[in-house]
Amino acid sequence: MNMKMNKCPDCKIYTMEDACPQCGGELKVIYPPKFSIEDKYGKYRRILKKEAMNKKDD
């Protein structure tokens, strides 16, 4: 068992178990990634944000 809070994307249940207690499915970690001055994925995040804004305007 890990000591981080997880969430089942199907059941929307929060737990600290390794598998969802209701459906037995895979869990996702809910914590954001650590902050880094050298933002490796900033370029991609900005591209996705720009695309989302363009879709919203259409």
Curated annotation (Swiss-Prot):
The keyword Ribonucleoprotein applies. Keywords: Ribonucleoprotein, Ribosome biogenesis, rRNA processing. One of its GO terms (biological process) is pseudouridine synthesis. InterPro entries: H/ACA_rnp_Nop10, H/ACA_rnp_Nop10_sf, Nop10_arc-typ. One of its GO terms (molecular function) is snoRNA binding. It comes from the Archaea. Belongs to the NOP10 family. Involved in ribosome biogenesis; more specifically in 18S rRNA pseudouridylation and in cleavage of pre-rRNA. This is Ribosome biogenesis protein Nop10.
